[in-house]
């Protein structure tokens, strides 16, 4: 369902200062398909063999998978952890973990990180890969990184030269074309009590991937999201629609809301619709973005057990989600850091994103407050939809370290998993259609 991208994509301007960059040289781009994969990942494994070479990803479903099913069995269900990290040994591994992960291990003795063998399962359609190779020498970032030009559907900058280009890779990465899922969002308070924040139905579309041979135009919608809330009772009947264009400078993102009590659809600021997941880069124009580099990290990966969990309540344990459901692996990530510009205001002074080299998904992020203290931390849970050649990052969650609370959003397992569907009609993507779907 790639929920991170859907809710995340309420993105405003990407006014990223000096991060704009020209295309890479043909000599550099020649590494794609040789030492690099076509999306820019290192094909080789790492020095000690804990990260294997890339061999094309996971394209064969387990024998227990039923063709056409939206619940995907875990292909690694029989594996055992190679390593368990907790507060007692966290200092040995802290350089390979996000700041949030380290803080949780130090704060809660019961918290643990179960590290399993690494599997580079990401697989994309060949046409998307071919487009990504072409983009390396053709795509351009404009307006200080705020917009892009001459991009075919795929990774726009497989060899990124800046923080802005890396973030565009994250935004425009392949996540399927049309997705329909039912989901829950849960809050867990400081006392460890879980409560249902919202239940809903999500339709997500990435229209730029409907025609893989057509370059983006400035006004082309690259992402659109339609949410209808079914619970709890106080939220039932509400709906939200978001649309984001390829050039947010000329065509800013738009959002609409339907409230059943008012019985009308109104346009709202897309900035007003924010969710605390790793992809939420609300007010990106307020930050200077830097591509820090690439790093080997222990991150949530191949989390089929969590993504397709049948009972959400088994996840929502006090202080942190149940470690029994979280699979961690060592992978290489791009580290991208955003620092608040002088004179700008935001609750986050600094943000640090960890982007998977094989998919460009944001696997995690750390957020810091105005005093420079770690404030919140977010995680997305990756699994490869092996029957569809789609890398997915569902669900996602955020820890509020200042309050000792957390939220997990996009829990789809209890509602049948992730469905890749035919597109909705054009008439269903207009604001006027929201009133009909939102009335109780």
Segments and roles (model prediction):
Residues 26-252:
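Solvent-exposed N-terminal domain segments of exported/luminal and surface proteins
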Residues 23-24, 29-57, 98, 226-286, ...:
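Gly/Pro-enriched, hydrophobic low-complexity segments
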Residues 9-14:
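Hydrophobic helical h-region of N-terminal Sec-dependent signal peptides
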Residues 181-231, 278-353, 363:
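Extended beta-strand-rich segments in extracellular/periplasmic secretory proteins, especially
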Residues 17-20:
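N-terminal signal peptide c-region/cleavage motif recognized by signal peptidases
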Residues 1-8:
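Bacterial N-terminal signal peptides that target proteins for export
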Residues 108-109, 290, 386-389, 399-401, ...:
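Short, intrinsically disordered/low-complexity patches at protein termini
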Residues 416-440:
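Long, C-terminal catalytic modules of enzymes
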């Amino acid at each position: 369902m790639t929920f991170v991208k859907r809710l995340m994509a309420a993105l405003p301007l990407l006014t990223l200062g000096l991060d704009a960059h020209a295309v890479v040289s043909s000599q550099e781009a020649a590494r794609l398909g040789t030492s690099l994969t076509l999306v820019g990942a290192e094909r080789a494994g790492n020095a000690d063999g804990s990260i294997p070479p890339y061999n094309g990803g996971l394209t064969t479903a387990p024998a227990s998978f039923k063709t056409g099913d939206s619940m995907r069995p875990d292909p690694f269900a029989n594996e055992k952890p190679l390593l368990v990290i907790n507060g007692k040994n966290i200092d040995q591994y802290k350089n390979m973990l996000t700041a949030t992960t380290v803080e949780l291990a130090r704060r809660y003795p019961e918290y643990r990180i179960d590290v399993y063998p690494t599997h580079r399962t990401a697989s994309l359609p060949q046409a998307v890969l071919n487009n990504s190779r072409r983009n390396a020498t053709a795509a351009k970032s404009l307006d200080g990184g705020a917009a892009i030009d001459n991009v075919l559907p795929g990774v726009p900058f497989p060899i990124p030269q800046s923080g802005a280009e890396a973030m565009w890779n994250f935004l425009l990465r392949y996540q399927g074309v049309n997705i329909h899922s039912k989901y829950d969002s849960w809050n867990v308070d400081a006392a460890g009590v879980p409560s249902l924040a919202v239940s809903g139905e999500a339709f997500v579309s990435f229209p730029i991937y409907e025609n893989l041979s057509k370059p983006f135009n400035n006004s082309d919608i690259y992402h659109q999201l339609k949410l209808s809330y079914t619970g709890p009772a106080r939220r039932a009947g509400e709906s939200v629609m978001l649309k984001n264009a390829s050039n947010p400078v000329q065509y800013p993102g738009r959002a609409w809301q339907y409230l059943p009590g008012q019985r009308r659809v109104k346009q709202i600021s897309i900035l007003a619709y924010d969710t605390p997941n790793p992809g939420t880069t609300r007010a990106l124009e307020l930050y200077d973005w830097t591509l820090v580099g690439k790093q080997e990290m222990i991150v949530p990966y191949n989390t089929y057990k969590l993504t397709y969990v049948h009972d959400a309540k088994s996840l929502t344990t006090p202080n942190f989600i149940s470690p029994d459901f979280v699979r961690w692996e060592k992978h290489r990530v791009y580290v991208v850091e955003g620092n608040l510009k002088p004179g700008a205001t935001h609750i986050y002074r600094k943000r640090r994103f960890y982007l998977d080299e094989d998919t460009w998904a944001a696997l995690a992020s750390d957020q810091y407050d105005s005093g420079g203290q770690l404030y919140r931390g977010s995680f997305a849970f990756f699994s490869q939809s092996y029957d569809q050649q789609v890398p997915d990052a569902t669900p996602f969650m955020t820890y509020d370290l200042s309050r000792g609370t957390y939220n997990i959003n996009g829990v789809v397992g209890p509602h049948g998993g992730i469905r890749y569907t035919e597109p909705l009609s054009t008439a269903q993507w207009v604001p006027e259609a929201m009133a009909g779907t939102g009335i109780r």
